UniProtKB/Swiss-Prot annotation:
Organism: Arabidopsis thaliana
Keyword Nucleotide-binding attached: no
Family as reported in the entry's similarity comment: Belongs to the NPH3 family.
GO annotation terms (biological process): protein ubiquitination; response to abscisic acid
TM spans (from-to): none
Domain NPH3 residues, every copy: 200-466
Its job: May act as a substrate-specific adapter of an E3 ubiquitin-protein ligase complex (CUL3-RBX1-BTB) which mediates the ubiquitination and subsequent proteasomal degradation of target proteins.
Keyword Transcription regulation: no
Keywords linked to the UniProt accession: Ubl conjugation pathway
Stored Gene3D superfamilies: Potassium Channel Kv1.1, Chain A (3.30.710.10)
Pathway: Protein modification; protein ubiquitination
The protein's name: BTB/POZ domain-containing protein At1g50280
Domain of life: Eukaryota
Length: 525
């Protein structure tokens, strides 16, 4: 160790620097004071003075920059990639003109003044450098000043990005900053507009910034968790969160570290979407927004607000829209069935106030969609019977002219879940309206070995009893079945069914009607 290195600095409890007291204290008032105090307390036999410094801006990299400045006689190359760090270090260590002419604080302050009046790219680069020293940069007001400068550039070149808050903070800037638009900015923005980006020319650059800085921007313009009126800001937040989600595999640690900030940004984006409403966002776009924002721990209030917006226009949805993967454990199912049930409840409740003709048309549309959805989710091994019924029974009976689609979904479910109990097989058929089954489907149901016998009989009884008859005996088009219907209601109804031998063995006398097996056509089923 060189005899000149008589100062030991332990930085943030992890790093150690050996420096010369005279060199370092020449520029730093804080270090000069700490050295003086340490000399009073130290053992006279110890030549090296030890100083502990915690929470230093930029950590060891920041302190190395300061040391380089001191050892190069107060000179260092300052650029947009390090000026924010150097500025915070100079404030932290008290490197003002009081101790040295043209000290680090003055040099960084002059450079930043040029940045405030300079190009868009320089402002963004300085904001990026603030991420390394965010706590200090925010405390010293540097983040606010850079965001003001950035927003000033955006407001000058984005017609739709205007609000009273922009006017208020713009007035706090100097006249030079408020009216300045550099030639380089003009060329950059012109290229963006030519590419069709218009008011979104700044999106990609700002997306590279940390959520802490974006959240600070949102707070400055008064849009934090409020019903923001700026559609451009809403679109930016959606773009920002989508981009961060796409890089999640590479930045999982960063996302977890900033979980609270991302959640706040997502909630703010939802407020903007709700303010814009369905006139701005299509049903498909709203589903996309829900997929993206649900990954950032939305608050319950935001989730309900977004789901309500989607539910009110659910008749415009497609099957792909509804097939949203469940989050977390797959034990509850591959698809987010609970979400669809909630959306259906909103839809049905919202349609109660519609005119009858419009309500009936929309109900029929959503009925067809949900039947497709049921068939799609039925093979899921983790889909429980109550969840299946929750979807099927979310719509009123009037939403379906025919229940064939529901039966097909039940058939798929039974084939995919061979270990269901007899009680579950009976329970899942609860959602069927037998009178709205076609005769062909009714016959398929009766042949289906997965369907409990009592369900098959009840379906056939309801279907035959629902026919209009002109004679006492009715022959169904397919000769597999024949029905004799007695109009004397006081007497038992005799229902003759041609069914499989296996089913015949399981049939018993039920209620007020007798079941009689016909042997003539067993082989045909």
């Amino acid at each position: 160790m060189s005899p000149l290195n008589d100062l030991k600095i332990n930085l943030n409890g992890q790093y150690t620097f050996f420096l010369n007291q005279n060199v370092i204290s020449k520029y730093s008032g804080s270090l000069r004071k700490m050295i003086k105090q340490s000399k009073k307390k130290r053992n006279k036999k110890k030549r090296i003075i030890t100083i502990e410094i915690n929470d230093f801006p930029g950590g060891p990299d920041g302190f190395e920059l300061v040391s380089r400045f001191c050892y190069h006689n107060g000179e260092i190359l300052i650029d947009v990639s390090n000026v924010s760090t150097l500025y915070c270090c100079s404030v932290f260590l008290g490197m003002s003109e009081k101790f040295c002419f043209s000290n680090l604080f003055l040099q960084t302050e002059k450079f930043l003044e040029e940045v405030f009046y300079g190009s868009w790219s320089d402002i963004v680069s300085c904001l990026k450098n603030c991420e390394q020293v965010f706590f200090q940069a925010d405390s010293y007001g540097l983040v606010d000043k850079l965001i003001f400068a950035a927003l000033n550039k955006i407001s000058q070149n984005s017609d739709d990005f205007s609000s009273s808050s922009l006017s208020s903070f713009a007035s706090s800037l100097s006249p030079e900053m408020a009216k300045n638009t550099s030639e380089s900015d003009g060329r950059y923005i012109s290229r963006s507009v030519a590419c069709g980006r218009s008011n979104e020319w700044w999106f990609e650059d700002m997306t590279n910034l940390s959520p802490k800085i974006i959240l600070k921007l949102v707070m400055i313009i008064g849009a934090y968790k409020t019903n923001i009126k700026s559609l451009v800001l809403t679109r930016f937040l959606l773009h920002y969160l989508k981009t961060k989600l796409q890089t999640k595999s590479r930045t999982t640690t960063e996302l977890m570290r900033n979980k609270l900030e991302y959640s706040d940004l997502a909630d703010t984006a939802v407020r903007g979407v709700i303010s814009a409403g369905t006139r701005t966002f299509s049903c498909r776009k709203l589903f996309w927004i829900l997929r993206v924002l649900s990954s950032f721990s939305l608050s319950r209030e935001s989730r309900i607000g977004l789901e309500t917006l989607i539910g009110e226009m659910l008749e415009q949805a497609t099957l792909d829209d509804l097939l949203i993967s469940a989050r977390g454990s797959r034990e509850s199912g591959f698809y987010n069935v609970d979400l669809v049930i909630r959306l259906l409840k909103v839809f049905v409740k919202n349609r109660e106030e519609e005119e009858e003709e419009s309500r009936e048309r929309n109900m029929k549309e959503i009925g067809k969609l949900i039947d497709k959805y049921l068939r799609e989710i039925s093979p899921d091994q983790n889909l429980k019977v109550p969840k299946f019924l929750g979807v099927a029974e979310s719509l009123p009976d009037s939403a379906r002219d025919c229940f064939d689609g529901v039966y097909r979904a039940i058939d798929i479910y039974l084939q995919s879940h061979p270990n269901l109990t007899p009680q579950d097989r009976t329970e899942i058929c609860r959602c069927l309206n037998y009178k709205k089954l076609t005769m062909e489907t009714c016959k398929q149901l009766a042949r289906n070995p997965k369907i409990p016998p009592e369900i098959a009989i009840e379906a056939l009884k309801s279907r035959c009893g629902n026919q209009e008859h002109t004679t006492s005996d009715v022959k169904v088009a397919n000769k597999s079945f024949s029905c004799r219907y007695s109009e004397e209601k006081k007497k038992p109804v005799v229902l003759h069914l041609e069914i499989t031998e296996k089913l015949a063995e399981r049939l018993k006398t039920k209620g007020g009607y007798n079941l009689k097996v016909m042997d003539s056509f067993r082989e045909g089923l």
